[in-house]
């Protein structure tokens, strides 16, 4: 397979895996990160979508002026099962996730300015307004990790910006899964024993990780096909507006 790392040298890369997400969701996800963080390259692995062809996803991404490079590798293979017998890591058999993300790092991302890992239903932010890529680039070890907030499915909505409310209980609103951003220029990233996946980077160097208070992400229950859990159900308790998210959306063009 061809290696595109030189083509993406210096780029701020956003990546994820997709299956049957609305094209409007995909556009808003990419456009948000382009406007807020300076994303100018997107790699979206398509895992056998049946609603459209990979070329339609690519056209959606290429229609965003700020995205200088986009690719949609087609991986129509089994995502992998959950193994309940392995309590410590029941997701160990999800080989497509680990394999595809290692492919993104090695075939596209090694020379990028930064890599950002968020799913289609997740938007990254910072309290200060700084780019998440700059936080990773300026960090001591090159890898920043951050947690998020669940944004509730409070009604019908076509895009992320249609949802801005979270549960009033801070503990219930916490999305515990960790997301990350990486400066791939760090020497430890060159080791082939380093394997990124959704919530971690396996084989990372000791002390390479930091968790800056400035970084966060929003996890949208209303932007979901319910493939994993029934997330689009009504909120389980009282909700309040996430002021920072609402302010961020207010600064974007309609």
Task: List each language-model region with its residue ranges.
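Catalytic-site signature of metal-activated, phosphate-bearing donor transferases
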Residues: 1, 126-254
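N-proximal low-complexity "stem/linker" segments adjacent to membrane-targeting elements
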Residues: 1-27
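Active-site-proximal specificity loops/subdomain of glycosyltransferases
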Residues: 12-13, 50-114
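An acidic- and aromatic-residue-enriched active-site/binding cleft used to recognize and process polar
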Residues: 19, 38-39, 47-50, 75-78, ...
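A short acidic (Asp/Glu
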Residues: 25-28, 52-57, 83-84, 126-130, ...
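Short, hydrophobic/aromatic alpha-helical segments in well-folded domains
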Residues: 28-32, 100-103, 119, 131-132
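Short, acidic, metal-binding catalytic loop of nucleotide-sugar glycosyltransferases
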Residues: 31-40
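Short beta-strand-to-loop acidic/aromatic patch adjacent to the donor-nucleotide binding site
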Residues: 44, 104, 111-125
